[in-house]
From Swiss-Prot:
<feature type="binding site">
    <location>
        <begin position="91"/>
        <end position="94"/>
    </location>
    <ligand>
        <name>5-phospho-alpha-D-ribose 1-diphosphate</name>
    </ligand>
</feature>
<feature type="binding site">
    <location>
        <begin position="109"/>
        <end position="117"/>
    </location>
    <ligand>
        <name>5-phospho-alpha-D-ribose 1-diphosphate</name>
    </ligand>
</feature>
<keyword id="KW-0028">Amino-acid biosynthesis</keyword>
<dbReference type="InterPro" id="IPR000312">
    <property type="entry name" value="Glycosyl_Trfase_fam3"/>
</dbReference>
<dbReference type="GO" id="GO:0005829">
    <property type="term" value="C:cytosol"/>
</dbReference>
<dbReference type="GO" id="GO:0004048">
    <property type="term" value="F:anthranilate phosphoribosyltransferase activity"/>
</dbReference>
<feature type="binding site">
    <location>
        <position position="89"/>
    </location>
    <ligand>
        <name>5-phospho-alpha-D-ribose 1-diphosphate</name>
    </ligand>
</feature>
<comment type="function">
    <text>Catalyzes the transfer of the phosphoribosyl group of 5-phosphorylribose-1-pyrophosphate (PRPP) to anthranilate to yield N-(5'-phosphoribosyl)-anthranilate (PRA).</text>
</comment>
<comment type="pathway">
    <text>Amino-acid biosynthesis; L-tryptophan biosynthesis; L-tryptophan from chorismate: step 2/5.</text>
</comment>
<keyword id="KW-0057">Aromatic amino acid biosynthesis</keyword>
<keyword id="KW-0479">Metal-binding</keyword>
<protein>
    <recommendedName>
        <fullName>Anthranilate phosphoribosyltransferase</fullName>
        <ecNumber>2.4.2.18</ecNumber>
    </recommendedName>
</protein>
<feature type="binding site">
    <location>
        <position position="121"/>
    </location>
    <ligand>
        <name>5-phospho-alpha-D-ribose 1-diphosphate</name>
    </ligand>
</feature>
<feature type="binding site">
    <location>
        <position position="81"/>
    </location>
    <ligand>
        <name>5-phospho-alpha-D-ribose 1-diphosphate</name>
    </ligand>
</feature>
<dbReference type="InterPro" id="IPR036320">
    <property type="entry name" value="Glycosyl_Trfase_fam3_N_dom_sf"/>
</dbReference>
<keyword id="KW-0822">Tryptophan biosynthesis</keyword>
<feature type="binding site">
    <location>
        <position position="81"/>
    </location>
    <ligand>
        <name>anthranilate 1</name>
    </ligand>
</feature>
Amino acid sequence: MTDLKPFLAKAASREPLTRDEARAAFDILMSGQATPSQIGGFLMALRVRGESVDEIVGAVTTMRSKMLTVEAPADAIDIVGTGGDASGTYNISTLAALIVAGAGVPVAKHGNRALSSKSGAADNLSALGVNIDVGPEIISRCIAEASVGFMFAQLHHSAMRHVGPSRVELGTRTIFNLLGPLSNPAGVRRQLLGVFSPQWLVPLAEVMRDLGSECVWVVHGDGLDEITTTGITKVAALEDGKIRTFELSPADFGVSPCVLADIKGGDGVANAAALREVLGGAKNAYRDVSLANAAASLVISGKVETIRDGMKLAAHSLDSGATALALDKLIAVSNDID
């Protein structure tokens, strides 16, 4: 089917689409076969009613089928957030990814430019000297040689160009804010996935279960799409096909609580400078919150069994210089494109 109207009518009547219907509808959207009015109407109908697990699974299935893929080890992990929390923090998941890479776990980092902050992962890494405009072969080399590679979302999801203008005109969150982090081009099956609202914790864990993920922690920390050290982090963890919910506090990581202002960042250049300060030995709130996210990621990866063991390994990665070396290698390999 190449006509969105039947799906638009069903969504407008507040009736959920089946998984197959959602897959077909998003194929129409992402193939350029729907008008801007149809795209906007359809996305807002889903938003107002509330997107279902089946609709998200169907949409992700279509998005994954159209993406430019990257080869990565089977045990690779991604540390990624939906964005949209409007917090303007430092690039926590970026530093956490480098720490995890330094600890010997391959990271296939998926990200984009800033959505609601001044610096997204792409802005931050670019300011650090990483070449983010590279193809799958170079990214695979980065993962092999630096234990971390960065996949710039807009280069891997070109079909998004068909819905981009409508999303900009709508000016509000749509289902597409959720789809990117669920569509890792390297097909990772282990993720630390931050979400902008706690209402999505269990639903997204269910989505990842239905899509075949092995271990995913979906987290929301005190308003952030990250594990936080400002207060309580809520977690929905997919492990061995089962979902459990729990909470984490700064004490669980052995760090002192901070306030949001302590981890507020700036633009890509400012955040790059802050990241390099931590690599240089600075002991501050940015270090603590990044270690916390890295520690959880090391548990998810299976490298360690407990958060405290994860903190020890993450701190060793930083303090031994392994994290800095991972960044240096990422910069070198990503720029070696002759």
